[in-house]
Amino acid sequence: MDASAPRLDCTGTTPPIGYRQYHPDVSINFQCNRWVQWIGPSAVDEVAELAARADTYPELIDGFLGLAQRARGADRALAGAYYDRSAEFFMSATDPRRPAARTRFLTALRTIYDVTPELIAFGSGFMPAYDLRPERQIGPTILMFGGFDSYVEEFLPMIAGMVDTGRRIVVFEGPGQGSALEDHGLTMIPEWEQPVAAVLDHYRLEDVAAVGISLGGGLVIRAAAFEPRISQVVAFDILDDFFEAVARQIGRGVRIPLRALLTAHASRIINGIAGWAAARKPVSEWGLQQGMHVTGTATPYEFLRSTTAMSTGKISHLVRGDVLLLAGADDHYVPLRQLRRQADALVNARSVTTRVFTAVDQASNHCQLGNIGAVSRLIESWLDVTASVLDRDTAARTSAPVHR
């Protein structure tokens, strides 16, 4: 890994970028903050200007493609890469511009950080992975993966900062994610212990700390329930019921009746509701299209049925290691009630630590955008505390937060 490549400050030396108001649509505003988080302060005014004039996804796509071209022309390779990724994010799976935007993003990030993925065989395809090692390792090897719409390259500024502090990080994309999906056709599966086992086998790893980001916060609980080589678990953030999170984006009050309709196999009614929601909310249309693409399903009904399998309620009691559960007080994707529900379900975990980030932290939204450096510090300090303080022969349990 290139030591001169940009790092996200994980030490707290510089002020966090913060979470700003760019756009009145809460989901678009979240995505604007997402890309500014990785690019840095130079992106604030550019994104604000674009958000002020763009109200539709096509306008955002064209705007971010323009910013990417301008950034590349000014030798701002990192900004150009993330602007290409932001445009690609808003594109439909069938948009002819999508493959080129994705290729520019991946090529730029891999060049900037001087990394090349290994391909790990899984099922009918391959999963890309990176083994990023420090000069002198501190603590356990960290196994990291993303969620519903992520490329692991997106996290390289954060990962590089953590490697600088002595952490060895093995990060990979599993079925339904990034290049595993786009290049190798692997669609999402709920049995996340299977790709995790393949990665652990490939690198001959034991006694790892697993960090799951976004939807990965639910997948990591699933993996830890069935994979004994995971001894420490970080849900960044919690997501114990993916269906609940998806239903929340479709509309207020639809979760219970929608679940009943799924139980009744009312596909025609559900597809009609999905069409209504997609016409009303751009994020619903994007989520349904992307969801079908990620899961390899053909209809909204089939996609929504697949989300019901991504729940940790029935398997959380199988987790026996130390667990850190993170949440944002203002997360617009994942309701905060999932934090307590997930914590209460981990009845056999050796320890359970929870942390809710608020606006005071500038990290109160999904995955703590605005102050991801605080999360990196928390994860590292928690790993050190659980390794040095907790008696390995006890089953201590605490809900007291670990502070920065």
Annotated model-derived regions:
Residues 158, 321, 335-345:
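Short alpha-helix in the alpha/beta-hydrolase fold that links the catalytic acid
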Residues 154, 185-205:
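Alpha/beta-hydrolase active-site loop
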Residues 226-305, 326:
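Hydrolase active-site cap/lid region
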Residues 91, 358-374:
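Catalytic histidine-centered segment of alpha/beta-hydrolase-like enzymes
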Residues 344-364:
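Catalytic histidine neighborhood in serine/cysteine hydrolases
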Residues 162-179:
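Conserved alpha/beta-hydrolase
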Residues 54, 64, 92-136:
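N-terminal cap/lid segment of alpha/beta-hydrolase-fold proteins
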Residues 319, 325-327, 331:
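Short beta-strand/loop motif that positions the catalytic acidic residue
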